[in-house]
């Protein structure tokens, strides 16, 4: 982890390593200022760490833009638009590399767009199980190991949700529409990456 932290810092990311989920939660809360407006991309990792639940149950300390309350696609679109102006955007990354790059595949694009631009800060929590040797390996990992179980979790009728294997589909339900590699951050102190020494997410 020490090597990856150095590589990430070289890319103007703030990087940290925590041994456990509990440490990761504490670290994330030390980064997020009270009184902030917070939004989140869909993330099993953020939920597993307990960060999402903490933010939601401390409404006196934070304003949370909750996408789960959307009743239809238009409301969801408006909530995603508000998230772009949040103070802190919470997410995981689909993979990250030994040389410190972030690699993500997205469906709607709301998650990767927030990573690229908009929120003042992005807080990323990721398990060390998502570490890969290279960007090419990262994309392979995501399509082979992450997206099929994610489609099952989301109840999407994609070929991979049935077979467990990426079929390189063009399905309307595909979550593999946008491929984004984040090489560095133009703005220092914007992107915070918390690596956790546990298997988290997909």
Task: List each language-model region with its residue ranges.
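N-terminal active-site beta-alpha-beta segment that forms phosphate/nucleotide-binding
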Residues: 2-80, 85-90
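Conserved phosphate- and dinucleotide-binding cores of soluble alpha/beta proteins
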Residues: 84-202
């Amino acid at each position: 982890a020490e090597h990856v932290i150095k590589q990430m810092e070289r890319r103007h990311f703030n990087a940290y390593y925590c041994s456990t989920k509990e440490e990761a939660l504490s670290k994330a809360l030390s980064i997020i200022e009270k009184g902030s407006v917070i939004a989140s991309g869909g993330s099993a990792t953020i939920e597993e760490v307990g960060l999402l639940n903490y933010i939601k149950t401390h409404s006196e300390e934070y304003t949370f833009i909750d996408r789960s309350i959307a009743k239809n696609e238009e409301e969801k679109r408006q909530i995603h638009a508000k998230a772009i102006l949040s103070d802190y955007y919470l997410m995981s990354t689909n993979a990250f590399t030994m040389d410190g790059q972030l690699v993500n595949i997205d469906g709607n694009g709301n998650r990767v767009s927030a990573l690229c631009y908009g929120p003042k800060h992005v807080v990323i929590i990721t398990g060390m199980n998502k570490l890969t040797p290279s960007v090419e390996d990262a994309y392979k990992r995501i399509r082979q190991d992450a997206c099929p179980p994610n489609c099952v979790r989301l109840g999407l009728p994609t070929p991979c949700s049935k077979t467990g294997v990426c079929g390189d589909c063009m399905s309307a339900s595909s979550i593999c529409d946008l491929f984004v590699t984040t090489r560095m951050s133009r703005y220092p102190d914007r992107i915070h990456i918390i690596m956790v020494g546990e298997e988290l997410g997909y």
